[in-house]
Amino acid sequence: CYQAEEEVLKFHLQEAMQRVNMDAQPNGFATIIMDELNPDKIKKLKTACHEIAVKGDFIKYKNIYSGVLTECSSQSAGIQLADFAAGIMNGYLRGALLSRGKYEFATDLFNEFILPNLRHHPDGRIMGYGVREVPSDTTIRNKLSALFER
């Protein structure tokens, strides 16, 4: 099943925007800032972000800026922190799903810094709140649930 890159980017961005908007409610405000390394992809993401924010979906984006701002990652502590978190998550998932036992350091960092800060339901569930599979896939969700719902 092939989908155009723009649609895939829009789908992932929409997932992120929904989470950010929910966390910013009722009185907060959020802005999405991305690394400016890939101008073509940034242009597609900016277009997708604007379409989602203006045309909307089932969520009204009142608490999120209707565009994407870009910044050089070497000058942005926020982007560097996001890269650090993504790297830890990548290492944790690789170790848990692909090569058990070879990613102890990433697992330790995940348990100390990422897991306690993941968005979760009031009952403690992380899947569907702080971790979502995109697009929805029951097989992948079951594998991830085993890792995040301890």
What kind of feature is each model-predicted range?
Residues 1-150:
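A two-mode feature
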